[in-house]
C-alpha cells in the first residue's frame, strides 16, 4: 500500500513525538509518524515509580553490546525504548540539560549556531516547570517538570551527606550553577510521568493532518538518486510505502538511526558492500563516534526499612497502590532516582566531570545488585560525564529484523577508568558520612575491607553498565566524519534530515533527554523556516 505525506518522521521516541506534534501544528501539511513499538498504554509507564519495571520487556529493544574488552569482556544489556515516547516513556524521569559549556563546545566542534546562547530559548520553549521560572526556565511548555512532593528520608540523608563532605546544596541543577547536591527535578506532571508522547503527541492526536503508525518495522528509506522520497515499512504483515513530498526526518535514536541509514545505503561504503547493500552515499561517520555514560553502582543494606524496598512486601505494596489511586501521592509518585550530585574527580576541573544518581532502593533496575530478600537498601550510581572512549554501531546483517552490533567501547580510554574509579571512591565516601552512615548496616562488596584505588578500578570493570545515554553516531558538524550539517541535513543528500541524540557532536555532561527534546524543537523551526 502506498500513501502520501508532506513529512514523514521515522521513530516515535523522545525526538519523534516532539517533531510530529510541532510539524502538524500547521494544518496545511500532512505528517506521518512511524514507530516500531506500541502505544504507551501500559499503566506502569505513567506511574513515576514504574520505570524500574520498564528497563526490560516488550517496550525495549533486546540489545546486548559486543563483548567489552576493557570491562572484563562482558556483554552488557543495552536498553533502548521501543514505544511511543521512546526513552522518555521508560526512563527515570530525571530532568537535567547539561552544562552551558557543553553547547559552547558543540559550536567549537563545528555545530555552528548551537552554543548555549543559541539553544537556551528552545529549552525554555519545551519546559513547563511547576516550580522555577525566570531566565533559566520555561513554565508554559509541553514537557511537565516538577519537584518531588515527598522525597524518601534516605534521599534527604544523601543530600546531607554530600554537604558533610563539602559539596554545596544545589536546588536547581539547570540554573546558574550545576555543581553540588540536591533532589532532582523530574519530567512529572500532576504526579504522573510526562513523556513526549504525553506532553507533545497526545494533544496532537486529534489532528486530521497527523497519522501515527505503530508496531511498524521500517525496512529502508527510498531514494531517487540522492533525494529521499519515501519509507518502506511492514505493519500488520503488509509491506507499505509512505511517500514524502517535502522531507523525511529520521528520529530513531543513536542506535536505530545509524542502523536505518546504513540499511538504506548511507554510511561507510566498504561496510555497506560487505553486507550487500548498494551505496547511495558514502558517509564514513555513520555509526562512528558512539558515546555513552558508563555507570557504576554501589549498593548498601540498611538497618531499617526506610527505603522503597519495603514496598516489595505485599501489604505495603497494596497500601502504596491504594494511596496513589486515591491521592496521587506516596511512593508510587516517586521516580526512585531522587537524589543527585554533580562534582569533580579533579578539583582543578573547570566544570563537574562526575554525576551521581541516588536511588532510594536496591536493585531497582534489571541487572543491578540487590540486597537479601526482606531487607531494604539504597543504590548510588556514578558516571564520567564526558568520556574519552568512542564506540561504534555496525550492521550485523542486511536484514532489518536483526539488531545491529553495538560496541560502546566502555573504558577504552584509560582516563575513563581512572575517573570512574574516582567516582566509586567518592560514592563510598558519601555512604560513609554521618547522615547516611547511621542508616547503613553494610556496604555490599566493600564491607569489612579497606578499599584501594585498584579495588575501585576492578569494581568498575566488573560492574559498570550503560546509563542509557547513547549519542553522537551521526554527528553534526563540518569535518569528514560528520553526517549532518548544523541545520541537520544529511551531507550530500536532499529531502532528509536526522533529528535525535545521534546528531550531538559530543556527549553532554548530564542526562540526555532534555537536550534531545531541545534539538527537536529547533529542528521544527528549521523545517518550518522559522530559524
Swiss-Prot record:
The keyword Nuclease does not apply. Its EC number is 1.1.99.32. InterPro entries: FAD/NAD-bd_sf (IPR036188), GMC_OxRdtase (IPR012132), GMC_OxRdtase_N (IPR000172), GMC_OxRtase_C (IPR007867). Pfam families: GMC_oxred_C, GMC_oxred_N. Keywords: FAD, Flavoprotein, Oxidoreductase. The active site is at 469 (proton acceptor). It catalyses: L-sorbopyranose + A = 1-dehydro-L-sorbose + AH2. This is L-sorbose 1-dehydrogenase. Its cofactor is FAD. It comes from the Bacteria. One of its GO terms (molecular function) is flavin adenine dinucleotide binding. Belongs to the GMC oxidoreductase family.
